[in-house]
Amino acid sequence: TMTILICIPCLMTGGTEIQTLNLVQAFVAEGYRVVTTCYFEYSDDMVVRFQKAGSEVVCLSPTGTRVNGWRGILFLYKGLRRVLKQYKPDVAHVQYMAPGAIPILLLRWLGTRQIIATVHTVADIYPNLRLVHFIQRHCVRAFTCITELAERSFFGTSRLYNENTPLNKRNHFTIYNALPPGFSIVSENRSFS
């Protein structure tokens, strides 16, 4: 049985977590063994939801707190090394949220060759895309975005992935997330008094 490692900075209640939970359910339904590794913050409720979906869950931070700077890199290195030794995943799927690049670089350094990254936002939150482009070109098998607009904001072009899409030279794609499409964004003036 193929083991898939899902890497995510936090397991709270948000769109990325719900999308990742849907991903876990799909992998489990196809017969894969899924291990979800949460680096930092988590809610017990969300951990239980992932477990009920069929994933084993490893929370690296016993207190659910974030570790920053060099200590954070060392913390992630030790935690990911322990998870890789214990579960020996065939594929790592990293949710590209802060710290997005560091876990990918550490996984590569620790010998993981099959890495997929998914970014859940558009590129305007990044002051510079050089690191994202380096990761996309040299460190991951595929870099997926949740909308074509997001993919274009990162890479200048987009392509909706389907089962016939070849995974060769071009390794960034759009795979729409499974969140309801019916959200409307309303711009309104609000007074905070």
Task: Report each predicted region and the residues it spans.
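Membrane-interface segments of envelope glycosyltransferases acting on lipid-linked substrates or membrane lipids
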Residues: 1-193
